[in-house]
Amino acid sequence: FYISQNYSYAILRPLQNAILARGDQVAWFLEGSEVNTSYLLANEIQLNSVNAVNKYQADVVFIPGNVVPDFISGIKVGVFHGFNSGKLNRCGFEDHFNIRGCFDLYCTQGPNTTLPFIELAEQHQHFSVKQTGWPALDPLFDLSKISKNTKPTILMCSTFSRALTCAPHLFETVKRLSEKGKWKWLIQFHPKMPTEIVEQYKSLESESLSFIETDNVIPLLQQADVMVCDTSSVLMMFLMLNKPVVTFNNISPKDYMVNITDEDKLEESIEYALSYPAELKTKVEHFISDTHPYVDGKSAERVLAAADELLAGKNVAKKRKPFNLLRRFKMRKKLNYWQL
């Protein structure tokens, strides 16, 4: 497992469980300063250098991030770090579909991402595509963990980007609503959220509001009745539980969201979402079938089957991956690895 962010642990652990269950081995390589070794469990193996990674001789490297070095062994399988939330890259294209020439296989989540990736595979011809579902969601569908709340519970999640985040805009409104005590608030932000905003929300902690720092958002998703969000892809994970989301200034609002552009509308929008009208519920269900139709908790097994297929010489791309000289140099410099 090649990771560079703390949220990767929760994405890959269902895959780790499936690998270990069939008697195979797993090791972790942590790249950069934004991923904490403290999140590793006692029984998890860490490889501390690129030399150790290559000595390990992995058959498959699973990556939830966007890039992976070409100079480590194993076929490279992209499993994504979230859903396509419509975020655009610097060139104005949807970042979810940015082909960087690093992967042999993309394991897609559902029809609305599989079809574009199949088109891209036909265009580039140096990677394969298999629809598997997203392993990160496997624990989400453990119905025994779904909470029965005595008080309506609102989960607020926000991305860190200044252009997209709802956190600074909604602070005063969330403060006022939490002081009312009508709902229970859970606040969880992207790990890159500016410290000053984190401290602001931590100052609101009370019987009605908890600020939670975690590498695993799934228990929070299971606990909440409604999510308040912006353009963070975590909102799509919440929708998979067939629960409503209120978004603030979403860059690509859809009919399965309750989107607002005025913070004064937050309270009434949450009330509307809590009532979960049939029309909204139908739209959410259509979104689920198009985005991630699997609710069996077995996406990890499907990812492994897709990797096995590639290792067996099936579903192989027609061409080799591009040379990517500049990207290769950047990765070697980043990891300070110059061996051939």
Predicted feature locations:
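Active-site and donor-binding regions of nucleotide-sugar-utilizing enzymes
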Residues: F1-F141
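Conserved catalytic-core segment of nucleotide-activated headgroup transferases in glycan assembly
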Residues: S8-L20, V129-Y201, V295, S299-E301
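Short, polar loop motifs at secondary-structure junctions
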Residues: E31-N36, F62-P69, P191-P194, T231-L235, ...
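Short acidic-hydrophobic, aromatic-tinged amphipathic segments that line or gate anion-handling sites
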Residues: I45-N51, L209-T214, M257-Y272
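Donor nucleotide-activated moiety binding/catalytic core segment of transferases
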Residues: N48-N54, M193-M240
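A donor-sugar binding/catalytic signature common to diverse glycosyltransferases
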Residues: V67, I72-G78, T214-M257
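Catalytic binding pocket for nucleotide-activated donors in carbohydrate/polymer assembly enzymes
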Residues: R100, H124-H126, S233-V295
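C-terminal amphipathic helix plus adjacent low-complexity
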Residues: E268, L274-L340
